[in-house]
Amino acid sequence: MNKAPTTLIIMDGFGLTDPGPGNAVSLAQTPQLDRLFAEYAHTTLSASGLDVGLPAGQMGNSEVGHTNIGGGRVVFQDLPRISRAIDDGSFFENAAYNKAMDDCLEKGSSLHLYGLLSDGGVHSHIQHLYALLQMARNKGLARVYVHAFLDGRDVSPTSGKGFVADCQEKCRALGVGKIATVMGRYYAMDRDNRWERVQLAYDAMVYGEGIQNPDPVDAVAQSYENDVTDEFMEPVVCDPDGTISDNDSIIFFNFRPDRAREITRAIVDPEFDGFQREFFPTTYVCNTEYDASMPNVLVAWPRIPVKNGLGEYLSAMGMTQLRIAETEKYAHVTFFFNGGVEKQYPGEDRVLVPSPKVATYDLQPEMSAYEVCDKCIERINSGAYDVIILNFANCDMVGHTGVLQAAVKAVETVDTCVGRVVEATLKMGGIAMVTADHGNAEVMLQPDGSPMTAHTTNLVPFILCGAGNELRPGRLADIAPTILDVMGLAAPQEMDGQTLIVK
């Protein structure tokens, strides 16, 4: 017998705010979403700050959003967890950090600190780097090198120069640390197997190859003069003595796993074959668990498991489920949605659609949405699934480019696809829910008219198609209990979210 699915459609980066010249959501032609808002019960959800386990006022992001949606509860995030440890002093007692630094003292080797030099709080926080520098000073380490990955997505595209200058000043004040390399996250934090990019980052940090400039602040300024903003800054070597070599220690201070895996694997995995390089031993600390299969690493902050999240609970109830997304958001509907669990649960199928191989997604704002849509509808029509979790990446990934017209096209693409998926779900007698994990495309311009590439703290929509006449406002943690509610299932006690349906 064919199943009538409950389909959750996550429009990544689709927030709500007043219409305006930089609002790609309101500027776009969205006949499908307009119709859904007119015909079905809808409400708004909080997707930032304390409501998703982040510090008050901190913008949400895809990892946090999917973890909260899948968990059915507010999941306390790594950013405040690590920041709180700095405040209470337990940070400096961390076993992995101490092992890395003690190995340097024992072997007379160098300590390398690398990660995203930003206060965006999505992948990292610069204050965590500063705490590591303070710890290195307290231990009396002599050779400490910072490899700075510039952001330009979760913060202003030209904020990197200021962060580099601040980092230099912090090193001077502490009397420890030198910036060895500077580069855009485009190279060091790829997540789409673009090994030619990762290799340029690797070659700069390990071999000292790349543009040479002893002044890291000037290196960033030169990049701006060439009209290359932070995210895309080519790797620059500032101190050729600061290359990574045998028996050195490395602490990767990013706490978000998805963009930390590739460069980490290139260094720690003897079986790595993304590009030619020689393996050598290091003491390597991942700030959080980037990948359970990663060899030769220590984990500073092991993940606190999310027990009885939606995926695990549906599986235990004998239900079937599908997770589908293109490459850029595949980890979010699987690993993050499952609370940091890589393995598939019994009854859980996964479909990965490759993201297009373009330099930046403003060049192809439709990305792979139409193929994701087609494959999802095939699976809906198969009648094989009780629950389908689907992500459209466009509004977020194109929003990050800062190109307004491309973001408008991205919203219009998602609108078309959402309409088709909802229609297919309802035709099968199912229920469709349309929501987002955080805002982005609804604010594409800064107040001064310059591009806005970061996420927002705006509310996100929630539309319930095929069930329920009245909904209350809520937060992302309320989505899983709502899914269980429309399926006639009681939520497990671990879920503290509440159904959005007003009884």
Q: Could you tell me what each predicted segment is?
A:
Residues 1-503:
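Feature captures the catalytic ectodomains and active-site-proximal regions of enzymes
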